[in-house]
């Protein structure tokens, strides 16, 4: 079996760094979980883009007469939250759907709830916190309308991220509870060390993929058991 080579993030060749993770949705994720996993990945991308747009909004805030603190913090949030959100909540849910790991699901719930709280705070927009939220944007309309209009763009995006994050958390929680997952199951994985055993993870992945393949082939198997009748042409 060929060794999997890390391919994410896809860095340009002139950067003297190598990708840190291997990511292949079609190869790793069972078909029944593929759509939800990709949606969570797109949510991470939207959050990263929003942080970049927020940096532009804070630059307009600075040019319009705001303090430099917000711009500095916006830059810090961009370089900090983009990789941390990928490592802390997307990789756990990717691994959870890949290996059906309750421990990974619990890690996702813990970190993603923190992500949801952060998204709400960003949408609110407390002045001096480096985010163009509603409070900061609305209050700046009286100072510089042009800058406030630019600030309104990341404000709306932060709001969308917060709403989508709540929906995503609800969807994953509903799936996890419906599949029989529980906190005690995650504790059992932690105690036995199954969450970090590559052989157990591979077996779980193969079982999940096999179950998905069996579900897809079930109608074909059902029809294959129908008796075949042959008739002789001789009279």
From Swiss-Prot:
> What does the UniProt keyword field contain?
Cell membrane, Cytoplasmic vesicle, Endosome, Exocytosis, Golgi apparatus, Membrane, Protein transport, Synapse, Transmembrane, Transmembrane helix, Transport
Q: Which domain of life is it from?
A: Eukaryota
Q: Does the UniProt entry include the keyword Coiled coil? A: no
| GO terms for MF | protein-containing complex binding
Transmembrane ranges?
40-60, 68-88, 103-125, 149-169
Which loops or segments lie on the Cytoplasmic side of the membrane, by the record?
1-39, 89-102, 170-235
In terms of InterPro entries, this protein maps to:
SCAMP
Q: Does the keyword Cell membrane apply?
A: yes
Q: From the Swiss-Prot or TrEMBL record, state where the protein is found.
A: Cell membrane; Golgi apparatus membrane; Golgi apparatus, trans-Golgi network membrane; Recycling endosome membrane
Q: How does the record say this protein sits in the membrane?
A: Multi-pass membrane protein
Pfam families from the UniProt entry: SCAMP
**Its GO biological process terms?**
exocytosis; negative regulation of endocytosis; positive regulation of calcium ion-dependent exocytosis; positive regulation of cytokine production; protein transport; regulation of synaptic vesicle endocytosis; response to endoplasmic reticulum stress
May I have one GO cellular component term?
A: membrane
Q: Which residues lie on this side of the membrane: Extracellular?
A: 61-67, 126-148
What this chain does, per the entry, is described as: Required for the calcium-dependent exocytosis of signal sequence-containing cytokines such as CCL5. Probably acts in cooperation with the SNARE machinery.
- Family of the protein in this entry: Belongs to the SCAMP family. SCAMP5 subfamily.
On assembly, the entry states:
Interacts (via C-terminal part) with SYT1 and SYT2; interaction with synaptotagmins making a link with the SNARE molecules. Interacts with SLC9A7.
Its protein name is: Secretory carrier-associated membrane protein 5
Q: Which species? A: Rattus norvegicus
């Amino acid at each position: 079996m060929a060794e999997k080579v890390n391919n994410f993030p896809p860095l340009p060749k002139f950067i003297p760094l190598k990708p840190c993770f291997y990511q292949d949705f079609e190869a790793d994720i069972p078909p029944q979980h593929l759509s939800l996993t990709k949606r969570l990945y797109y949510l991470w991308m939207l959050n990263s883009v929003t942080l970049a747009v927020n940096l532009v909004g804070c630059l307009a805030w600075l040019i319009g007469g705001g303090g430099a603190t917000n711009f500095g913090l916006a830059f810090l949030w961009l370089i900090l939250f983009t990789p941390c959100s990928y490592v802390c909540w997307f990789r756990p849910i990717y691994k959870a759907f890949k290996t059906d790991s309750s421990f990974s699901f619990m890690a996702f719930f813990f970190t993603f709830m923190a992500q949801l709280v952060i998204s709400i705070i960003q949408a609110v927009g407390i002045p001096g916190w480096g985010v163009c939220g509603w409070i900061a944007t609305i209050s700046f309309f009286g100072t510089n309308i042009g800058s406030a209009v630019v600030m309104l763009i990341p404000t709306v995006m932060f709001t969308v991220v917060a709403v989508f994050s709540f929906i995503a958390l609800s969807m994953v929680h509903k799936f996890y509870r419906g599949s029989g997952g529980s906190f005690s199951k995650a504790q059992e994985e932690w105690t036995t060390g199954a969450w970090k055993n590559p052989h157990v993870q591979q077996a779980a992945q193969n079982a999940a993929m096999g179950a998905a393949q069996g579900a897809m082939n079930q109608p074909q198997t059902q029809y294959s058991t129908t008796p075949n009748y042959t008739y002789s042409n001789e009279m």
